Design a protein with these regions (language model features):
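Catalytic cores and adjacent binding grooves of peptidoglycan-active enzymes
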Residues: 75-83, 87-136
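Glycine-rich, flexible loop/turn motifs
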Residues: 3, 7, 66, 73, ...
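Helix N-cap and loop-to-helix transition residues
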Residues: 12, 37, 63, 90-91
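Extracytoplasmic cell-surface/polysaccharide-interacting catalytic and binding patches
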Residues: 1-48, 123, 133-136
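N-terminal start-of-chain detector that recognizes signal peptides
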Residues: 28-30, 55-60, 90-94
Length: 136
């Protein structure tokens, strides 16, 4: 699989792979190809389609070195696959729409921040569903 390979209609391998260029991993581009990846990305594509607007992935998979360097939780879903998504234009209403639709679609993890929403499918691997809001 090359970095230009599309995983879904609107999301590519490159967008999801580890981009730790400013970290100790040097941008290793790792991305485990697993059932969890496809499950999560099918849901993310469906969310994007329902939203009717493009989403920027600001963080996808992280290797352990990258995750440590950004202060990620030791058991972060980004070590598997999670996506921090940001609507273009950082529109607050669109962030709320992303949160609402993600909840309706039963994403396993939904975390709302000032400029992005964290989405993951932790339930797929047996983790407890989680919701949090870190907006200031």
């Amino acid at each position: 699989m090359t970095t230009n390979t599309q995983i879904t209609e609107n999301f590519s391998y490159k967008e999801l792979s580890c981009k730790g260029a400013d970290t100790s991993c040097g941008g290793c581009n790792s991305l485990p190809i697993t059932d969890l990846l496809y499950y999560h990305m099918d849901k993310l594509q469906a969310l994007r389609t329902r939203l009717g607007a493009p989403l920027r992935i600001t963080s996808g998979h992280r290797c352990e070195r990258h995750n440590r360097s950004v202060g990620g939780a030791p058991n972060s879903m980004h070590l598997h696959i999670a996506t921090d998504v940001q609507p273009f234009g950082e529109n607050e209403e669109v962030l709320q729409d992303v949160e609402k639709i993600a909840g309706e679609m039963k994403f396993g993890g939904i975390g709302v921040y000032n400029s992005f929403v964290h989405l993951d499918s932790r339930d797929f691997i047996g983790r407890e569903i989680a919701r949090w809001n870190n907006q200031t």
